[in-house]
Swiss-Prot record:
This is Uridylate kinase. The gene is pyrH. Coiled coil: none annotated. Keywords: ATP-binding, Cytoplasm, Kinase, Nucleotide-binding, Pyrimidine biosynthesis, Transferase. It is found in: Cytoplasm.
Amino acid sequence: MDVVFALGGSVLMPKEGASTENIQNYAKAFKKLKEMGHRVSVVVGGGNTARQYISVAREFANESFCDEIGILATRMNSMLLISALGKDAVKQVPENFKDAEIILNMDKILVMGGTHPAHTTDAVSATLAEFIDADLLVIATNVDGVYNKDPRCNENAVKLDKINTKELLEITGSSSMSAGSSGVVDPLASKIIDRAKLKTIVVKGIPEEILASVTGNHNGTTITP
Ligand code: U5P
């Protein structure tokens, strides 16, 4: 299967900082999927590094400048994952989808970060999945699925096991577009998932759920056209 993962920067690089074991466990999961014969792409987010830098820069700069800072953080996190993947990856972070596809065609795990301002790496992962005709997009993030309301501010929010892309558009449509924002799925990504009719799974970004999203029995939300 041809699978694109959006790996939240905050799961790869939690608030407490980088941990060798944590990065290694993600690298192992992606290597395992490659060994099983899957074609694997990983789009890495900017996490806390991006958010810390953006919150200071915002005092001086406009949103697209802050986005550019966020993009640099996504590429730095990408380099960290690439370092742990060793010979299974290429020591370069592509900045567009054509260069990304060349890496996949070299039979390597593709790792990339952001591309242009005004969206998050969710939108990058959805566009990459469309561009390479992937079979599955997996959004591995800091929540365990899509809820009917934002679970961070609604105690009675309910996790949805299965939704369609139109329902995803309704749920995510009102999320913020400002630099560093962190809704469960970026609204632009939802639009791309809908237009490209991409089968998508949103799971908690832990190695076990990343593996289960491809092999079955994950605990997240499945989104179908
Ligand atoms: N960002 C972009 N374009 C991209 C990827 C990221 O502008 O293609 C910026 C956004 O401000 C985003 C931040 O919130 O970098 C960190 O990425 P993410 O962790 O939110 O995906």
